[in-house]
């Protein structure tokens, strides 16, 4: 069986300037801001399991994911949350789990923490091993 991938995007895009987006992100996370989202183009009623990933922003899920997870009815669904971060995971997975259950998920399983380098010149270097990531993906298949 295949999978369907849907991107969660804000209606108003973030700046491409690193300093501007980090300042904006810090403010939004601290305020619990939930931005307006573009439609994902997928009817979640057709799925039993939903895998949701987020970058970690100031120890929490990104505002777009907070907005999405707050607005979705997960009744009868199994939710698999994952996060990416550079060494400071915070409460992201716990928060995602609580929100999924609050919105009706029957089960939250196989939550995954994916770590990248915190070295500014190597931020795209994944520190979680490919073997570990492949094993997690295999569990989900």
Task: Kindly label every feature range from the protein language model.
Residues 10-13, 56-60, 85-89, 114-119:
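Solvent-exposed loop/turn segments at secondary-structure junctions
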Residues 1-52, 59-61, 66, 70, ...:
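N-terminal beta1-alpha1-beta2 submodule of the flavodoxin-like/Rossmannoid cofactor-binding fold
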Residues 80-116, 123:
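Short, glycine-/small-residue-rich phosphate/pyrophosphate-handling segment
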Residues 120-128:
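A short acidic/glycine-rich loop-to-helix N-cap element
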Residues 48-54, 79-83:
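Short glycine-rich or small-residue beta-strand-to-loop segments that form or flank ligand, phosphate
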């Amino acid at each position: 069986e295949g999978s369907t991938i849907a991107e969660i995007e804000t209606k108003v895009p973030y700046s491409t300037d690193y300093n501007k987006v980090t300042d904006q992100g810090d403010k939004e996370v601290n305020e619990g801001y939930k931005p307006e989202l573009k439609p994902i183009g997928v009817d979640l009623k057709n799925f039993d399991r939903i895998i949701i990933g987020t970058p970690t922003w100031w120890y929490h899920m990104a505002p777009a994911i907070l907005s999405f997870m707050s607005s979705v009815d997960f009744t009868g669904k199994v939710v698999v949350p994952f996060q990416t971060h550079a060494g400071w995971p915070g409460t992201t997975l716990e928060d995602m789990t609580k929100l999924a259950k609050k919105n009706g998920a029957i089960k939250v399983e196989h939550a995954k923490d994916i770590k990248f380098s915190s070295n500014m010149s190597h931020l795209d270097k994944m520190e979680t091993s490919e073997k570990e990531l492949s094993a997690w993906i295999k569990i989900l298949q």
